Amino acid sequence: MADERKDEGKAPHWTSASLTEAAAHPHSPEMKDQGGAGEGLSRNANGFPYREEEEGAFGEHRSQGTYSDTKENGINGELTSADRETAEEVSARIVQVVTAEAVAVLKGEQEKEAQHKDQPAALPLAAEETANLPPSPPPSPASEQTATVEEDLLTASKMEFPEQEKFPSSFAEPLDKGEMEFKMPSKPGEDFEHAALVPDTSKTPQDKKDLQGMEGEKLPPVPFAQTFGTNLEDRKQSTEPSIVMPSIGLSAEPPAPKEPKDWFIEMPTESKKDEWGLAAPISPGPLTPMREKDVLEDIPRWEGKQFDSPMPSPFHGGSFTLPLDTMKNERVSEGPRPFAPVFFQSDDKVSLQDPSALATSKESSKDEEPLKDKADKVADVSISEVTTLLGNVHSPVVEGYVGENISGEVKVTTDQEKKETSAPSVQEPTLTETEPQTKLDEKSTVSIEEAVAKKEESFKLRDDKTGVIQTSTEQSFSKEDQKGQEHTIDELKQDSFPISLEQAVTDAAMTSKTLGKVTSEPEAVSERREIQGLFEEKTADKNKLEGAGSATIAEVEMPFYEDKSGMSKYFETSALKEDMTRSTELGSDYYELSDSRGSAQESLDTISPKNQHDEKELQAKASQPSPPAQEAGYSTLAQSYTPDHPSELPEEPSSPQERMFTIDPKVYGEKRDLHSKNKDDLTLSRSLGLGGRSAIEQRSMSINLPMSCLDSIALGFNFGRGHDLSPLASDILTNTSGSMDEGDDYLPPTTPAVEKMPCFPIESKEEEDKAEQAKVTGGQTIQVETSSESPFPAKEYYKNGTVMAPDLPEMLDLAGTRSRLASVSADAEVARRKSVPSEAMLAESSTSLPPVADESPVTVKPDSQLEDMGYCVFNKYTVPLPSPVQDSENLSGESGSFYEGTDDKVRRDLATDLSLIEVKLAAAGRVKDEFTAEKEASPPTSADKSRLSREFDHDRKANDKLDTVLEKSEEHIDSKEHAKESEEMGGKVELFGLGITYDQASTKELITTKDTSPEKTEKGLSSVPEVAEVEPTTKADQGLDFAATKAEPSQLDIKVSDFGQMASGMNVDAGKAIELKFEVAQELTLSSEAPQEADSFMGVESGHIKEGGKVNETEVKEKVTKPDLVHQEAVDKEESYESSGEHESLTMESLKPDEGKKETSPETSLIQDEVALKLSVEIPCPPPVSEADLSTDEKGEVQMEFIQLPKEESTETPDIPAIPSDVTQPQPEAIVSEPAEVPSEEEEIEAGGEYDKLLFRSDTLQISDLLVSESREEFVETCPGELKGVVESVVTIEDDFITVVQTTTDEGESGSHSVRFAAPAQPEEERRPRPHDEELEIEMAAEAQAEPKDGSPDAPATPEKEEVAFSEYKTETYDDYKDETTIDDSIMDADSLWVDTQDDDRSILTEQLETIPKEERAEKDARRPSLEKHRKEKPFKTGRGRISTPERKVAKKEPSTVSRDEVRRKKAVYKKAELAKKSEVQAHSPSRKLILKPAIKYTRPTHLSCVKRKTTAASGDLAQAPGAFKQAKDKVTDGISKSPEKRSSLPRPSSILPPRRGVSGDREENSFSLNSSISSARRTTRSEPIRRAGKSGTSTPTTPGSTAITPGTPPSYSSRTPGTPGTPSYPRTPGTPKSGILVPSEKKVAIIRTPPKSPATPKQLRLINQPLPDLKNVKSKIGSTDNIKYQPKGGQVQIVTKKIDLSHVTSKCGSLKNIRHRPGGGRVKIESVKLDFKEKAQAKVGSLDNAHHVPGGGNVKIDSQKLNFREHAKARVDHGAEIITQSPSRSSVASPRRLSNVSSSGSINLLESPQLATLAEDVTAALAKQGL
């Protein structure tokens, strides 16, 4: 059960752990904030307490970290809270006890310890534990404590040793395995950290299931090897306390953990001395694994948490690696093993070596739980033993050093993680499996910082280790204990120790049970409260820690051990002070830690609580003030943390790595000291693959995950982002962050932390990260302060559901855009603060992120790795990688500095990041959508979505205002060169994207696209990659939340395990999370979704949401105000899904049901349209009806997304396989990926109105339009439900040549262009847009973009927008190629409204496809009316696309005031125009879409005009775009009422889609015509399907006119094209919202209301002035053009499929003769011939005579007789004859030299020879005779 638990819990937890580990550093701060002791350390890292804790915690912090980890592990997670409650009491009491006992123990018991250490005589390895103990020489109470701890540890070890002996039976195998494996990893001890990093992901899945606790601890360190090892060690300690806690339930087991400690100490003492990691694993491994498993088995709930504790204990012992490895090998081999090999290796090393030392401390701590009295002793003994252990470890400096490093750093991380684990524990109970991982990661985070401190202290110890090891260790322990451990241990003691010892046992068991129960029920709600309360407690705890400072030094030591159990018990390490009383209470309070994140994270955190926790922990650790759970409390923590280490902070920020250590400034400072002091630690770290101590410290401190993150990046996702959970997002973030974020507060790994830790902490962390980025630019000290502010920005980060978004962009921008981020930092922070409520959403999103990250560890990690390696990892967002060029152009004005400065890095990072973004956005979006669909579609969907719809209606109105505000704000931000928009949008967008992704895939994606895109464009897709990174986790979390996670087992193993873990954890959380999430998710999802989006989009609203105290209020407020945004986020997510492909349809379907519930919500209907559109794209429209199907698809897509994520690094091929439904899906994914950026680009353009933006927009949007057009065509074809003219485009990609077979079918109502990418295209999905046919892709993108942009308001529009975003990315990829062909696309992009219109068309198409679910359409009708109401209020006479555009614009307007004004101006025009009808159709979606689109639309014209040769047309478009925007808005508002009419007409644009494609070529020349046409067509199509879905039966007055508008899709090109009024017949004047929008300024003539003659006539689509480039003239590399009979009209593409008959192939070796294999299979005849060696073979020596061995075996009798071969050898050589003579029977037969019984090797074949009995004697006699 323990293993299962571990697997289940660990998978999510591990997934979280990956991200968490990546986010472990963010978690560390948060853990510090959250966990009393661990939090204290974190605080100390962030603030003075942390520093004190750090110093004290360097040696102590390991144990303390263990406690913190344990507490956070949820095993003793509550203990942390409870301990934290009585932190002061515990501090005083423990200080007394520990001081007295430490002195006594140091004096008397130190000798005991020395004796005991004789047991662990090799405990020079205790140096590792010394790492746990503050290895620093400060000889102070800590010194005494060290002796005491050692003594106690030895006592505990001895005590535990017998128990270990008890456990050996169960631990025996793990021990052997663990020892072997531990030795194995230990030997690669240098790689141990690396292994911890690399295997983290692998381990994570297995550990989640198998070693939730074990792995959790181990895995958490994996994020950064040391963190992982430390985490494992700390978790071990935690686990041991956990076991002790189970010991409460498993009284005997704590001794066993202690025993493992003894084993650890003794065996490590023996073996570990030389091979600490090697020998140590021997005894500890089994013990710890056994203990962990047994304890976990004993404690079901605590299992994962306990696994966290026990697992690290084996790690601590070093043998833990084996159990971890064994378990991980078992588990990791199962699913994560793919990642496991990398992560596991590093993790093993880190965990293996570190755990031995940490295990000793932690096991000592564990024992302390049951043995409170002894705990003091054990604490000292543990420390001393650890010191000894470290000393032993020092013997094998590399391994021992690694152990020390890992132990110290991991322990720091563990401490922080424990602290953080308090929060994750809160969620972990919900996700016992998932959460334990979070806890583990949190522990890991805590441990990492502790480990860093302890590592440095360990290093110091190592320096002093020989003679001074104990003294030095003790001194270090004392000094550092006094310094940092005062706080750390104070916290730990306050948090865990008192409760650990006294309550820990009771609370451990109780907490285990309580946590299990609370985990089940209160977890969701409680998590939120706990997160908030925990942060408050953390803040108070931090103060207490600071106040307890000195007293805590001695006390800390005790809590260090007691806390080990206590921390495991009570997650809130920090809470121990304040919430000593809370220890019991923390069962729920503990959940409170995860609660804010829990509500949001309950959805996602259930999936990857650890991720979120880790992310939050990362942020918490990096920015303690950041915990959004309690904005004020966490900020206070951050502030206190900042004050604590203001100098340290600047110190830390001095280098990104140092800034990483900002989390543990003290630890970092100590580490830096040790950095300088112990170069071998650096060497060890480097050996471990951590890149050296400073790198380790940087990574671990940056996020306490950056190591993990960087490692995962090196490994190349998410999740994940860290080493375990966040290798992907966190890792990318960490990698970027580690490189770019130069502060601890700046924790790109915070993204995992966001998802892992409570949303708030993560957000604040994210804010901190952002602030830190900005402050890295601005000031180091400010960064921490920014961290204080950060909680709100972090929430916005979480809003994106991907804290990673800002972090990643910031990371990406680190080199180039840091200044931009610095300028943006304030805005981003403001936005983040404003979006405190969105933090909950972000938490959910973050939660989803971890799974991705978990899966990402391989997927994202590879991406990160690849991008780190300089490989352009083409993920879904692969195309955006080229975007950096465009981004460079656009970013030149917006964030050009970033892209230009870090273009290569951005490209490389963006390649990964984009893939991550793509995957994460898609996954997060899918997960979010799944989550929303399943959860919100469930009661939450009904209630939440309905409420959201209502709120969305309100928000629609509010958004009109807020959009104005937000668009003004965005305009303001854009005015700030999008630097702040990039930062704010990056913060907002990232928060937004995260929250949105979590909220709804499309919303997240849309918002991410929208908000992040500006950042993307500015940051060169930095934001997008971040969003992707974070969002995949969100997706994963959501996917995990959903059975959907399990829906696609084909995902990566990690994906499966993540999803399995997450699903199990999330499903476990599903009941309560669905309920609580119904409450919280309704609240948080609504508040998070809306608030996050509102936060991102509504600077004003964000301001309100800004306050942590206002989180709920703001959430509600934003729920009301932000539903539009939330749904836009959903649209973004759905676009992200579109980008994801499968998830799009799933999201659409999921959203559809949601929309059904949100009938009144215009956003909902838009989402529904989007869902329909996505469905059309992803699911050709069969699944659109079934929400269950969607759920499954979503799940599949989520997993597929994860698969994509893992595969993403390779290419979009994973996505393509992930999108088997339709080849189109991959393109939508690709397209969606671009729209994610394009919308934001539009936003940037509109908001910024900058030429660069326009340029970038034009390029990107051109491509985006092409991609979107293509995608749109795909959509049309995919969902022929309402296809008037179905243009089926089968795109086959061969060697960059895209063969597009366009089959025009006039079967659908509206021209539906279905682009089906043949399987060949899938691998080149991303490239396809480039090669596809820039024209076709551009045209398609134009269609898709025009439609998505037009229909962007509609859900399909949003997907379209996401398609556009992806298209944009693709455009970037093949931007240059598309530049010419993209001129039209650019114009289309410029006609954001056009694109929106076509988005609406797409929505229409989707809706048409959704026509299958007529009910949904009816719902959409209902929704649309509500949307129309709101849209009417906000008249968007944008036509089908315009409606969405205006609304989107409204949201986007924040950046662009001109757009708003012009939109208003054009409102009247477009109100008149029947475009309003189309807008009406898009009305519901527009809020979201418009929010994103308006700026984009407005900007897009400018952008296009700038970039396009048709500057006149573009400028006309641009000039008109603002007016058109306003008109579109007006029309959208008007269109709301006219939505029915428009909807009917909207489907027509689908038919235009093929023409759009055909017009692609013309688009360059007549860009506007094409753009208008395509956009109109697309919008028309979208709006029409939307309208149809929304008002299936109602044909509004504009049936012809509306049709004209909608049909205008083909003429939409002409409408769009100023010079193409000739397409009027086809373009519907109203249906040319893009055209209309453009028309107001430049092509009002293009506003031809002539209904498209044949919506299904692709030929008319080609009537557009610019048909797609003549592909006939294109020469493909592979000659595929020969097969493409493609006419601009479309439908004439002939894709010839040649079947390859391999039957005629002849094998080189002729083996085919024997293989009766036919292609059909089944005819393979494998002949198995048994060999009779006796008959056929002749022995060289003649031994075969005696070998009666048949291959089958059975008759072989091997008699083993030991012969004196010394004599025999000589005899054989010299006296063989005599020997033969001596062998009676044998000698006669065998030649003198060839004894039949004696083989040539001298071994006697004692098979069946008669003389075998006497042979030995004979030989001996013969030899003896011969004088041998």
UniProtKB/Swiss-Prot annotation:
Residues 120-133, 1546-1557, 1567-1578, 1591-1607, 1783-1796 have a biased composition (Low complexity). The modification Phosphothreonine is found at residues 734, 1160, 1358, 1606, 1609, 1620, 1623, 1650. Residues 596-610, 778-790, 1613-1623 have a biased composition (Polar residues). Residues 702-745 are annotated as: Interaction with KNDC1. Phosphorylated at serine residues in K-X-G-S motifs by causing MAP/microtubule affinity-regulating kinase (MARK1 or MARK2), detachment from microtubules, and their disassembly. The interaction with KNDC1 enhances MAP2 threonine phosphorylation. One of its GO terms (cellular component) is dendrite. The modification Phosphoserine is found at residues 28, 136, 140, 143, 283, 333, 346, 476, 496, 520, 550, 596, 599, 603, 608, 626, 726, 730, 737, 739, 823, 883, 892, 938, 1050, 1139-1140, 1145, 1161, 1165, 1352, 1539, 1560, 1592, 1654, 1680, 1783, 1788, 1791, 1796, 1809. It is found in: Cytoplasm, Cytoskeleton; Cell projection, Dendrite. The modification Phosphotyrosine is found at residue 746. One of its GO terms (biological process) is dendrite development. GO terms for molecular function: calmodulin binding; cytoskeletal regulatory protein binding; microtubule binding. Interacts with KNDC1 (via KIND2); the interaction enhances MAP2 phosphorylation and localizes KNDC1 to dendrites. Interacts with DPYSL5. PANTHER family: MICROTUBULE-ASSOCIATED PROTEIN (PTHR11501), MICROTUBULE-ASSOCIATED PROTEIN 2 (PTHR11501:SF15). The exact function of MAP2 is unknown but MAPs may stabilize the microtubules against depolymerization. They also seem to have a stiffening effect on microtubules. This is Microtubule-associated protein 2. The lineage of its organism: Eukaryota, Metazoa, Chordata, Craniata, Vertebrata.
